[in-house]
């Protein structure tokens, strides 16, 4: 029997305010130059006409004031045009990173975005490869997708789509935040204790179906505190309290119809307001209840077998009869 536990307490701290413009970047220990920036500087060195077209001044001629002397063994000026000189050329042209703008950021830390860019303020703008930055961003916990643009002369724009936390998943005594695709998010579960709690192996892959089902019955949904997936086939709901709340055992087939019937019965007989511990709807056409004084409840106990009660309605045309567990067979 799995034990449904309370989620960890939410830490008391203020949430970091969002910054959509990140003008100040931390100084990195290294500047990573991409082949594009190096290639453009190389072409500027070899072809002055092309340098004018792309907005780069060609390097000064060897021997002229301010020129660089190629290293020993270099065959021509192009081979002597190193990474450091490329960075200086780009800086002289004003193509340096001065500002980062971000849209779509809510849960992703600004420092993580700057770290993915990897070039400090004042570094060469052409040293930033948008595709490489996009890959780094999409590896962050909250980022589902990202788009990166270099905007001349001095700006990088980042547009991200974040993953939406859907539920807390408890498995083997541990908690994790999951999104609508059932993927775990590397986030502090204590910050999301108000999310629905799903329990059991395979629960993340079926959680979206459950929440869509509950959306159709908001009166039930607002009372659900936990849902346990049994055998990756059906759900058992805990209402009002995780520890000792009302247990509702849904059937494997057509749980939506079962919830509809439960709402109808509650409207007629105020069933959910009675002193019950279990409402069992696993058998078609039959609803079994257990009074709270009948003893503790195992929310994951399975029905070994059994047939619908004689004369039970077929096809869910009207609410099934209510049978107390002590009066009817619960095989």
From Swiss-Prot:
Compartments (UniProt record): Cell inner membrane
Annotated HAMAP family: FtsQ_subfam
Family designation: Belongs to the FtsQ/DivIB family. FtsQ subfamily.
Gene behind this protein: ftsQ
Domain of life of the source: Bacteria
Transmembrane region(s): 25-45
Function: Essential cell division protein.
Membrane topology reported for the UniProt record: Single-pass type II membrane protein
Biased segments, Low complexity type: 304-317
An example Gene Ontology biological process: cell septum assembly
Record GO cellular component, one term: cell division site
The entry's keywords: Cell cycle, Cell division, Cell inner membrane, Cell membrane, Membrane, Transmembrane, Transmembrane helix
Region (Disordered): 1-21, 297-331
Protein known as: Cell division protein FtsQ
């Amino acid at each position: 029997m799995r034990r449904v536990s309370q989620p960890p307490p939410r830490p008391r701290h203020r949430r970091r305010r969002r910054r959509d413009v990140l003008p100040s970047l931390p100084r990195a220990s290294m500047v990573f130059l991409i082949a594009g920036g190096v290639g453009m500087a190389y072409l500027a060195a070899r072809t002055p006409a092309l340098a004018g077209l792309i907005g780069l001044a060609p390097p000064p001629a060897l021997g002229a004031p301010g020129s660089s002397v190629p290293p020993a063994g270099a065959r021509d000026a192009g081979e002597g045009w190193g990474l450091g000189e490329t960075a200086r050329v780009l800086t002289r042209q004003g193509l340096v990173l001065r500002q980062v703008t971000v849209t779509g950021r809510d849960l992703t830390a600004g420092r993580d975005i700057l770290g993915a860019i990897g070039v400090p303020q004042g570094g060469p703008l052409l040293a930033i490869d948008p595709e490489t930055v996009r890959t780094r961003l999409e590896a962050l916990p909250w980022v589902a997708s990202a788009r990166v643009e270099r905007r001349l002369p001095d700006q990088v724009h980042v547009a991200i789509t974040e993953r939406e936390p859907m539920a807390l998943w408890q498995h083997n005594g541990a908690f994790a935040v999951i999104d609508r695709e059932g993927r775990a998010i590397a986030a502090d579960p204590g910050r999301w204790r108000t999310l629905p709690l799903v329990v059991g192996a395979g629960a993340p892959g079926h959680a979206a179906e459950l929440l869509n089902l509950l959306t159709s019955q908001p009166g039930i949904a607002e009372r659900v505190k936990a849902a346990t997936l049994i055998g990756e086939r059906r759900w058992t709901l805990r209402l009002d309290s995780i520890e000792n709340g009302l247990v509702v055992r849904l059937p494997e087939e057509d749980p939506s119809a079962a919830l509809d019937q439960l709402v109808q019965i509650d409207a007629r007989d105020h069933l959910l307001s009675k002193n019950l511990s279990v409402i069992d709807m696993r058998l078609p056409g039959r609803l079994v209840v257990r009074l709270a004084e009948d003893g503790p409840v195992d929310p994951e106990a399975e029905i070994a077998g059994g047939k619908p009660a004689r004369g039970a309605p077929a096809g869910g045309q009207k609410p099934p009869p209510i049978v107390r567990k002590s009066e009817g067979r619960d095989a």
